[in-house]
């Protein structure tokens, strides 16, 4: 084994080391975000282990029936939510939490309060668990001005105010993608070390992609610009090859592929869901933040996604995100439609 390769293999950039490096670039940093992120990472490791069916044997019991004496198995999404809420509260760095699983925001006990708000979906795509499709955790972090008098209003900030965002995908491997506002980096969980190692430094999405990702089962309810765009993907007028369709139906997996390979992911509004289906605070915003940090863009059909100001915590929005030029094309179609309506 040559020495150079060996040196490279033994110099591990863990997520903790990466975040500490980022912190040291900012002279007024107190380490609060670093501590908060390490608690999120712990939550992700726990969920990764649970999703991988750790402890399954105890649950099923030797005879193959479900263990009757033991507690009934908690649904994974409920379990994941509890783990994240407890990890975030105990970090002492949060004052309010918004989870997809909880109808109301959670205000942290004053003694444990810190200056951050975390919005998260503990297990996105959890309806896919049984068929082995990748699922994930999504999170976005905001700063709160006055932690002692925090209100719901403080949570309803536009996405551009986020200080960090990321997702963790539990698939064939466990991958955590993170941005603290200075580019996007991907880390993979090394199960033998229990550490996330930097495997995808400085992710940049291709300027234009060959893939479109959308649930075409909703096509009959789409608006005009969406229908036109998908038509162009399939039957390009300019002689170029048609785009490939890839749709997993788990947002984390679809966005992850879009980020790495380029292309566009869309969940448009339709007649049944006039505001689309994805939630602003913990799906649309974090993914849009990552896309922009990676050189792509994100659009709601009306505006840049990160400029949207939500009015309630579980608000929904249509979303088009991905490669810069592909989203630019969608923006053009919406602009043309608006002009048409204006003239009528």
From Swiss-Prot:
EC numbers: 3.1.3.11
Classification via NCBIfam families: PRK09293.1-1, PRK09293.1-3
Record: residues binding Mg(2+) 3: 121, 124, 283
Entry's localization field: Cytoplasm
Amino acids binding substrate: 124-127, 215, 247, 267, 277
GO BP terms: fructose 1,6-bisphosphate metabolic process; fructose 6-phosphate metabolic process; fructose metabolic process; gluconeogenesis; sucrose biosynthetic process
Gene Ontology cellular-component annotations: cytosol
Additional note from the record: In plants there are two FBPase isozymes: one in the cytosol and the other in the chloroplast.
Cofactor: Mg(2+)
Catalyzed reactions: beta-D-fructose 1,6-bisphosphate + H2O = beta-D-fructose 6-phosphate + phosphate
SUPFAM superfamilies the UniProt entry points to: Carbohydrate phosphatase
Annotated positions binding Mg(2+) 2: 100, 121, 123
Record's keyword terms, sorted: Carbohydrate metabolism, Cytoplasm, Hydrolase, Magnesium, Metal-binding
Cofactor binding summary note: Binds 3 Mg(2+) ions per subunit.
GO molecular function, one term: metal ion binding
Assigned protein family: Belongs to the FBPase class 1 family.
This protein's name: Fructose-1,6-bisphosphatase, cytosolic
Residues annotated for Mg(2+) 1 binding in this entry: 71, 100
Record Pfam families: FBPase, FBPase_C
Organism: Oryza coarctata (Wild rice)
